[in-house]
Amino acid sequence: MAQRDTGGRLGAEFFTPGDSSFTAFLAAHRPALLSTRGLLPDGVRAAPDRVPHGTTVLALAYRDGVLIAGDRRATMGNLIAQRDLEKVHPADDYTAVAFAGTVGLALDMVKLYQVELAHFEKVEGVPMTLRAKATRLAGMIRQNLGQAMQGLAVVPLLVGYDLAARAGEHGRIFSFDVTGGPYEKTDFHAEGSGSPYARGALKKLFHPGMSRREAALAALQALYDAADDDSATGGPDISRRIFPVVSVITEDGFERLPESETEDLSREMVEQRHTRPDGPTAAM
């Protein structure tokens, strides 16, 4: 176990050569800090109505990069556990992660992933490639497989701006299964309980070369459709002024859209739904 010596200095393990993975360091010296490593007792499964779960997140590539968004609802069974949960987080300057699944484990995984990327860059002197970032996150998901099989799954969605990609291909999207299998997606993807409805909406609305405004509206429309058919997904809450989180990554780095911009776009979308409740149709 990592500890300080009696003189208040760091222990020898902090100066022992090893790889650049902070997760591997914790596993070797402080495994108790890795919440995704433990298993429930044999035969015990998590009760879904006792643990908050995040629901729908999505991403789509657009003209200047990639957009990632998520609704704000967390549920415990048929109860709303939280109305303003933030499921979209920057991982570093050019990468972001959103999650669906068990909230407590997901938030721990996101924080550890942020440290993992920063630690690698400090040790190696260069940032990871985007593919390596996806592989590293896949490994962290795989470490949670035991708990996932007992009902405590975390399913993240990773997006990044690939500085080394060809023009028009900078925005990249990766999804994962509960075993840690990484899958690069083309154009758009969604995860969580409302994802079938969100993907259906994005199939209608997505087109190459979308502007930031078009991409943001498409994401909001998709989340609205998901909330319309999936009770675990939250739509825009006009009365409480709680709206989806929408962020973009471009050559300038990660940016979360201001609340005022997201609110204006959400209100515009809801107003359009007054005359067309099922939302816009696909362009012919």
UniProtKB/Swiss-Prot annotation:
E.C. numbers: 3.4.25.1
GO biological process assignments: modification-dependent protein catabolic process; proteasomal protein catabolic process
Compartments, as annotated in UniProt: Cytoplasm
Region Disordered, residue ranges: 256-284
Propeptide segments, given as residue ranges: 1-54
Domain of life according to the entry: Bacteria
Main location: cytoplasm
Reactions this protein catalyses: Cleavage of peptide bonds with very broad specificity
InterPro entries to which the protein is assigned, alphabetical: Ntn_hydrolases_N, Proteasome_sua/b, Proteasome_suB-type, PSB_actinobac
UniProt keyword annotations, A-Z: Autocatalytic cleavage, Cytoplasm, Hydrolase, Protease, Proteasome, Threonine protease, Zymogen
Keyword Cytoplasm: yes
Notes on how activity is controlled: The formation of the proteasomal ATPase ARC-20S proteasome complex, likely via the docking of the C-termini of ARC into the intersubunit pockets in the alpha-rings, may trigger opening of the gate for substrate entry. Interconversion between the open-gate and close-gate conformations leads to a dynamic regulation of the 20S proteasome proteolysis activity.
One Gene Ontology cellular component: proteasome core complex, beta-subunit complex
GO terms for MF: threonine-type endopeptidase activity
Pathway info: Protein degradation; proteasomal Pup-dependent pathway
Compositionally biased region (Basic and acidic residues): 256-277
Catalytic residues identified in the record: T55
Subunit structure: The 20S proteasome core is composed of 14 alpha and 14 beta subunits that assemble into four stacked heptameric rings, resulting in a barrel-shaped structure. The two inner rings, each composed of seven catalytic beta subunits, are sandwiched by two outer rings, each composed of seven alpha subunits. The catalytic chamber with the active sites is on the inside of the barrel. Has a gated structure, the ends of the cylinder being occluded by the N-termini of the alpha-subunits. Is capped by the proteasome-associated ATPase, ARC.
Its biological purpose: Component of the proteasome core, a large protease complex with broad specificity involved in protein degradation.
Family: Belongs to the peptidase T1B family.
Record-given protein name: Proteasome subunit beta 1
Annotated source species: Streptomyces avermitilis (strain ATCC 31267 / DSM 46492 / JCM 5070 / NBRC 14893 / NCIMB 12804 / NRRL 8165 / MA-4680)
Gene: prcB1
